[in-house]
Structures are given as C-alpha cells and as structure tokens.
Amino acid sequence: MSTDVSERGAEAGSSSGLLSSPCVGDGSDSAQMKKRNTETAGMKARKKLRSEESGLSTLVSIASFGGQASPDRSKVSKQQNGASGHRPVTSCTHCRQHKIKCNASENFPSSCSRCERMGLQCEIDPQFRPKKGSQLQNLKNEIEELKTKLEFLLRSEGILSSAMRNSDLGRQILQAIKLQDSPQQQTGISVQTYLASEPELLKSESSVKSSVNTPSGSYSASAVDVSRAKTNSVPPLLNDSAPANSNRESLPPVLQMALKYHNSSHNTPIDTPSSHTTPMLSPEVKKPVVATTNAMPLLPSPYANIDEFVLGDVHIPIDKAKELHHIFVKKYLPYFPIMTTDSVTELYSQSQLLFWTIMLTACLSDPEPTLYNSLASLIKQLAIETCWIRTPRSTHISQALLILCNWPLPNQKVLDDCSYRFVGLAKSLSFQLGLHRGEFMSEFTRTQTLMPDAEKWRTRTWLGIFFAEQCWSSILGLPSTSQTDYFIEQARRGKFDLPVRFHRLLCLAHFQASLSNIMGSSVESPDGLMDAKERGSSLAALERELARLHSELKFDSDPVVEMYYLYAKLMIYCFAFLPETPKADQTQYVTEAYLAATRIITLLTKTLEDTQLIELPIYVRQSVTYAALILFKLHLTPYLPEKYVDSARQSIVTVHRLYRNQLTAWATGVENDISRTASVLEKLNFVLITYPEIFVEEDGIISRMRSHLTGTLFYDLIYCVHEARRRQVDSEYNEMLEKNRKEQPVHTAATGSQDTEKRAPKRRLFPLPFYNQISKEDFETITQTTPGGTTVTTLVPTKNAILQAKKLQRSQGGQKGEPIRSINGIPLAMLDATGSVNGALVGDNLNSSVPQAAVAASAPPEPAAVAATVPPEPAPAPGGQSYPLFQPLYVQPAANVPMQRSASASVAEALPFRRPGMPKITSESIASGNPNSLFGNDGSPFPAIAQKSAKPAPPAKPDGQPAKQPAPYPNLNVFLGANASARMASYSSLMDAADPLAPDPDRAPLAAPGPLAHISELDSFFLQQSAGWIEGSSSNDDFLGWYDINMAPEF
C-alpha cells in the first residue's frame, strides 16, 4: 500500500511539474482548453486522494489503539493533520459541550474519565456541534436532578438499611461506622450563640488580662485574637447575621478561633493521645463551638453529638431542648403552621434565631417563668443583631420573627411591644428574598439557604406575614400596608395545600383588609373614615359578605377560628359605633355585638379546660380582650337592653378573673398583654367608682376618639382613665363640682324635677365585682335565669364567712348589730351592686338555723327571701386542700341560653390548673389574726403604700362606747379629696331622681346601698387598683406610653 501511495505521489508531482512549466511555442485555443480541463481533473483527483489517505490513516490509528502505541504516532498525526487541513475529532460530545479536556481517544474503547465518573454515555461524533446556552441553567438542571436522587435515597432509607443489615458487606460497613462514632459519644460538645453587644460572653476583662501574660512572658494567640475582637469599632457578629459565603480571612477573629478549634478537633486522629487528654472536650470543661447558619455548616450532621445549647448565661441541656421542641410542635405550631422541624440539632444548624425563638415560646408551658424571663431579653437582642445590622439570607429568620409576633415578648405598655415592628421587618426581609414571587425567587438572591420543600414553606411564610400584619394592624388601630397578591388570592380560593384552620384564618384576614380599606381609607376626610351617612349601607354589605364566608367555610367548627370570626364581626360593629354615625345605625348592632362578645368569652372558658391562657396566640387573646372592652362600653350605654346588663357585667368579670387566673409565678413575674388588659379593666372600674360621669357625659358609644379604626374603642376607654386622673388633680373642677352640689336641690323619688331627670344618667353605674382570690369556705355561687333567657351567677357569702366577718369586726371595735362591710376583703357594696346580698343579710339577726331558700328560675326572689338565703358550706376538697378563686368556674351550656356562666365551687375543684402551694386565705384565718387581706397575697402583691398605712384599731373609750374607727385606708380618702363624698352624694341623688325604686321584671332587685355605698368604706380592692394614682405616679396607668416629661400636665 505504501508503494502505491508513493507512486501516485510521484505521478502527481511529475504532472504538476509539467503543468507548472511555462508553455513552449504557440498553440491553438482548443489545446489550451484541453490543458485547463486536464489541470482541473488532476486537482480533483488529488483532493479525492487526500481524503482517502485521511480515512485510511484514521482507521490505522484506531486499529492501533488496542495494542501498543506506535512510536511515530505523533509524527503520523502531524502528517495526517497537514494532509487533511483540520484536526480530527478526539473529544466526546459531553466534553465538547462543556469545553473541557477529554481523554476519550486515550481510553478507547472505554469511556472518558468524566463520562465514566458522571455515568454518561461517551461517544465521539464529528458531526456534533456544541449547543449555545446558559451554563447556569445546566447547573440548575443538574442540581435538581441530584436533589431528586437524594430525595429518592432518603425515601428508600429503610430499604437501604435493611439491605445493608442483610448482607455481610453492609454489616461490616455499619460496624465500622459505629466504631468511628463511639469515641465522639464519650465527649459531648456545647454550641453557643454569641451576642455582639455582650463582650463578656466572649471573654471577660479579667480573663483577657490573665491570658495575655503567658508563663513564658509572651502573648498567647487566643488572647490577642479576643482583645483584637473587643477593640474593633464594629463588634463581631457571631450569630445568624454572619455574612454568607465568607472565607476564613474575612471572618471575625473569634470566629476564626472557633473554626480553627473545630477543624483541629475533627481532623485529629482518634488514636492520638491529644484527642483523649484535651481538657476542652472533657465532660467537665466543654469548649463552645460557634455554629453559623450561612457561613459554613459547622455541624457535621443533624445527629451531631451536642449535649448543650448556650445563649448568654442560659444553658439548655439537649434533653430539655428536645422536650421544649416537642412541646412547640405539639402545642404551638398548629396555631400558626408556617414551618416544619424534625430535630433540635437540625433546627439549630438551620437558624439559631429560630431555634432560640422556639425554645422561648415552648417555655410558656413551664410552671414557672424562670427560663422564659432569662431568654426573653437575650432573644430580643439576638433578633436585633441578626436582622438590623446585616440582611439575613434565610426564610428561617422571617419565620422566627412571625413566631415572636404571635407569642409576643414580655412588655408593659403597648408602645413597648416589638411585635408590630417584627412584622414589618419580616415583611421587608421577605421582599428582599423574593418570597412574594415564589418560583422566581432565584431572581432576587442566589445565596439563600436551602430547605426541603422550599417553595411550599416560603409561600406559607409569606401568607403568615399577611395574616400577622392584619392582626396587629387591627390591635393597634393602624391601616394595613399589605395588598392582596397572587399567592394570597390563590390561598383564599383553596388552590394551595394548607391546613384547614390556617386557610380559614387567611380568609378572615383578607376580610379584615377589605373592611379597613373600605371603611377607613377615605381621602375625603382627615380621619380617613367613610362619611357617617354612608356607613350603614356599607357595613350591611360587609356583614352579608362575612355571613357568606361563614356559610361556606363553617367557622364555628373550630373554636379558635370561631373566636376570630366573631372578632371580625365586632370590628364591623365598632365602625358603626364611631362618632357621628346615625343613632339608628348604632342601635341595630348593639345586641349583635353583645351576643358576639359573650360568645367569645364562652368559647374561651371551654378552650381553657385543656389549655393555659398564656399558651394561646395573640389573635385569640386579642379577640377576648376586644370582647371584654366592648361589653364594658355597652353596659354603660342606654342602648343595651336591661335584660342583658347583668350578663354583660358578669362576662367582664369572667375575663378579668381568667386573665388574673394564671399560675402565681407567671402572674407576678411576667408583664404582657394579659396583665395589661386586666390592669386596664381594673383602672376602668376605679374610674367607674370615682368619676362615673366621664362615661356618660358624651352621647354615643364611642365619643372621644375616631382615628384609630377599630382600635378606637381601646383608646377611647384609655382616654377615660387619663381624664379621671386629670380631674383628680384639677382643683378648679373640684370647686365647680362642690358649687353645683350646693346649688342643687334635694330630690326624692316622688318629687324629682324635670331638669334633674334630663341631667341625670339613664342607668345606674355600679362597680364591677372584681377579685383576685376567694375560697370555697366564704362564697358560693347561685345561678339564675332571667325571663329574658340570660343566665346570671351571683356570689353569695356562706354562713361561716358571715360569722367570721362579724367576729373580725367586733374584734376591731365594731358595735353589736352593725352591718359588716366586707367578707375576706371583697366589699359588700360590690356584691350588693350585683344583687348578691341584702343589707338585712349581714345584720345581727342572723340565725344559724335558717334554712336555705330556693331560688326560682322564673322570677327573682324577694328581698326578704334573699336576706334569709344562707347556702350551706360546700364539701371539703379532696385531700383537704383549698384553691383560690382565680380558677375558671364552668357549667355546661343549657339549651337556648346565650351565655355560659360560672358554676359552684365544687366544679372548680376538678380543673387541671391548680396552685396547691398558695397559702389559704379565708375569712376564718383573717378573723384569727392573719393581717393579709384578699389582695395582700402573693397572687397580687400588696402595694407598698397599703402596708405603710395599716394601723391597729384604737382601744375603746372609757365610757364603754367603741372608738370611732378610722377609714380603712386614709390615703384613699386623701386621694379622693375633701369634695369626694359630696360629689358622690350629688351623683347618688341624681341617680335616685332618674331611677325611681321600681321593680324591674328583667333584673334582680337591688338593695338600698345605705352605709355600704359610702366611698370611705371601700376595701383593699380599690386600694390595689388605685395604687399608682395614690402615689401620684402615672406609670401604672400609662398603658400606651403616652406620658412624657415634656408633656403639659393639662393634656
């Protein structure tokens, strides 16, 4: 073959030489044409020859791959390339597509290294042309493919493990893994979250100074690193706010130290002595490992050998952390399902802020708030450092903020609550992360942490932000800034796979947004409210829309959702109660508001049978708070029918009792919305005692505020508290009141003037019987059903309580036959205001042999019958224990009864939440010399001023007559001032003139107050409520944080 090739080459060369030689002599044109054709044919023949030679050489080279390589292979390749004019294709199609080096020609007939590693089919195709496209998209496709394979492996974990256990090789692998992990189990580690603004958590000053001077007189590396970290102008951030994808050199010095330790501890061979003798890993002295969410995965796996979590000075063992994690998943997550979590260590590796937030929330179920109080301030600081200083690239941060919004951190005043700011922060972070764009989130960030079912939980988080903002906007009376987008609309229509409760709550939140936009976003008025004349028709349409939602979604199938649904109804009615709304539009919603509010309180009492109040999310507690406040307003107005007044009053008392009915440690150690609501009710009740005219001076239900949307109700009531305080220090007002009293004629029920009737309120304003503690030995409950169908439960003192109260009064110098003033610290004036007792009941004609009178359900008893009613003592509790009053008292709802009320004390004995450790305070213990009053117990600390003002009773006069007893609390009289009794007498005369003593068929008869109504005889209950007022301090009644040092006092 080589001979033929050479001969052909020689012929071609000779022919080319002849053709290239110049022509000799003259020839014809035909000869020239023939010559040119010959040259063309020769060129074609040479090209064909070259292609055949190239194909033959390729075959020869391929055939030679199976054996040893020829030493002249490179020379042949160069000859072939020079002969063909282009390089032969030696790379496979995959390597040509990615433009990477390929060794397919060297590995033939095997695949190239990359295709063999990737499991791809390797082929050489000279006709293949690389496709032009985005390498990033290809990488995304590969990542999705890997994720699919990983999910398949995870789902097949059980099959793989069983297969490994059934094979010899698998058992050997498992045994090797156990041997490798066994030394790590002997040395646990503690992971710590550092706070930048607390350098003592990194290392204290003393430890830094002591570690600077080493025994050799030089500086240790760790001391230098820590001191350098402490002197930085910007402190290092060693939590979720650490920058993402940072290299080691750009990290803070202390974090570099932790990484150095971590890498050395894991890279040290197990057999070396240092791994066993290092004191840092011993159980006694454990070196903290700094774990960050986004910088690098410091924890080897979700099952890392962690035995302690540290934040500041709080140490949580792994067993306690697992317990709290289980409590959160079981009790709290169903209320707000925006995340999923399986293990504590995995949760910590995902986000430290989310981990500590879950630990804090689960601590609400502890019997004592010790751990909760220790974590609260630290987590607030951690949230600020994580979110404000740098922008975290994780959805977990938004989830943590939303959890803090639903179970708020402790706060005393409304403006101190960070929840609304946390909602806004979570919303802004989610915007930056692209949570509002779902699958297009990659267009916003490429450094976000990954999680299983990422798009599902990101969407849940975005929906949770929408709900939380609507809830907190309604609480504070602020307009919502969220708008309905694609995800909210799809969720509302049921296109997403959401839990039923969460779907219903989102629908109600969407309705709240529509309600606020329609009624409170007008550009025609400065307060933003719709024109008063148009409110009625708009509210009617909104009420029909809410009824339609209820018929479709069945809100009443879930008590939690039903409470929030009724809260949405109360929001509609509140818009109707705003100033300038026509009276007809207001009155038509009064009864509906009463029914909705009392239903909320009934549902709460049922829910608290198996759940503590503090475990409920804010949207449930706000529904109850709003119901109590609107009932307080309604029961003072003439628009509420008389048959509902007693039930409304008792509903308010029930809320107050439940809100004060927490475990002693929680009631005294934590201030939040629960304690604030109870305090607001107590302050309002004190205003009802001292300045009741404030509530009836203006026409309408809500009369003084108007620009807070549905939150106007709360601010209108708070205004009454501040106005009462202003009048208390206003001497001009008191002088004018005294002048009006002197000019006012004395009126009786029969001779009342028309002018007096016009100026007098239309309804008596009685105080509410709030109390903090009661024992079954002193009071028993009697339930009545009025002709209007309202169930009313009253407290009736027992025979033993009355005897002990009389004994105590006589020991203090009281005269025989004088009516008693209080029983176990509860003023009888308050019980008398609700029809519980009669003046004759506490007289000296009490006979122990008086039988118990039956209480008719169809008609209220006559005063004489009530006077003779002495209920028997209830049976003692099992084990001889007595429980305080602040336990919810329940009864089963009767048919066609709109309210559920308290039952007898025997029912309360079976309730789950008890405080057996509290000392028992009864009337007998008080009579025997126990100076503690009802509110002097640890359940509600006695004010310091009350302790100072307690004085022993003066001795009797020589002539045998008892000395005149001083007022129980002189400071209260000082606060009320010299004109207080005159003002109360003036107000009482107005009430008597406006409300003649006529029997009311819908209400139980009220006994004449007599001396019991005198203001100086109020017991410690009112002293406790007025503690801040008496001390001249506004801190206790400044619920909003309005008072400022620069504010004018007349404001």
UniProtKB/Swiss-Prot annotation:
One of its GO terms (molecular function) is zinc ion binding. InterPro entries: prtT (IPR051089), Transcription_factor_dom_fun (IPR007219), Zn2-C6_fun-type_DNA-bd_sf (IPR036864), Zn2Cys6_DnaBD (IPR001138). Residues 92-122 bind DNA. Residues 1-54, 67-90, 206-227, 738-759, 927-968 are annotated as: Disordered. CDD domains: fungal_TF_MHR, GAL4. One of its GO terms (biological process) is DNA-templated transcription. Keywords: DNA-binding, Metal-binding, Nucleus, Transcription, Transcription regulation, Zinc. GO terms for cellular component: nucleus. It is found in: Nucleus. The lineage of its organism: Eukaryota, Fungi, Dikarya, Ascomycota, Saccharomycotina. This is Putative transcription factor SEF1. Its main location: nucleus. Residues 11-21, 206-218 have a biased composition (Low complexity). Putative transcription factor. The gene is SEF1. It comes from Eremothecium gossypii (strain ATCC 10895 / CBS 109.51 / FGSC 9923 / NRRL Y-1056) (Yeast). Residues 1-10 have a biased composition (Basic and acidic residues).
